Amino acid sequence: MAKSEVVNVALITGGARGIGRCIAATLAARGMAVMVADLLDTSECIEQIRGGGGKAMGVRADMADPAAAKEAVSRTVEAFGRLDILINNAGMHPQGRGWPPLREMELEFWERIVRANLTSTVVSSRAALPHLSDRRAGRIVNISGGGPWGPEWVSTYGNVAGRGPYMAAKAGVEILTRVLWEEEKDRGIAVTCLRPTIRIALDYEREEIRARHPGPEILMPHLLWLLSADPTEVGGRAFEFDGERLSAIPYLS
């Protein structure tokens, strides 16, 4: 693939399945070259994109590990010649209602959830920033987990008890969005955040769940808007999507 053919290049973390996979396919369908990074096998996602005529490569990487994140970014630039967009989607939310309360929670469990959801965003961003600032038009979109703030959380998981590490990590992602924007805006990097507050049915979930809830495709028009909007309009802000409207979250506006 000739590097001169590439116009926009995106690195999507946590892109092997779910929301990340949908993001990768959506961006590739619009002519972008995408690098899909995930701890999971990315081959199925890459084959899907290439089958539709898109440009894509995959890398198995723990994006909370600095060396692995740096390698993923380096492979992106080596393959496509540049890096314009980082989508921080990597994360983990153990399923079920059996999470322990904080007084009983093992510190290792807390650290594992925070590492997957918040540390990965920090580490991936640090690895990508030098290349994004080279473009002076770089974009970072952080995907926050909206469930704990949305009305469907209780009906799905019972309540927020026991969800401390996940909720703290995702709130941290939103605050980090503001911090990164303030630190990097003079280098031309726009940093923003998307928080879905509705239940999103993912491609690996049971059929009955996918029949009841919208898929990640419902988020894509809003993600594309965040990638194209004036940086002064979206930079440092988190936007929540409630299934009908996209609106700025007041405490980050």
Label each residue range with its predicted role.
Residues 125-126, 178:
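A short, exposed helix-loop element centered on a Lys and neighboring polar residues
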Residues 60-72, 107:
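The beta1-alpha1 cofactor-binding region of Rossmann-like NAD(H)/NADP(H)-dependent oxidoreductases
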Residues 3-35:
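Canonical Rossmann dinucleotide-binding motif of NAD(H)/NADP(H)-dependent dehydrogenases/reductases
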Residues 97-102, 106-111:
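Substrate-binding pocket helix/loop in short-chain dehydrogenase/reductase
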Residues 7-8, 54-55, 82-83, 97, ...:
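Active-site loop of short-chain dehydrogenase/reductase
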Residues 186, 193-194, 209-253:
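C-terminal helical subdomain
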Residues 93, 141-172, 177-178, 182-185, ...:
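Catalytic loop of short-chain dehydrogenase/reductase
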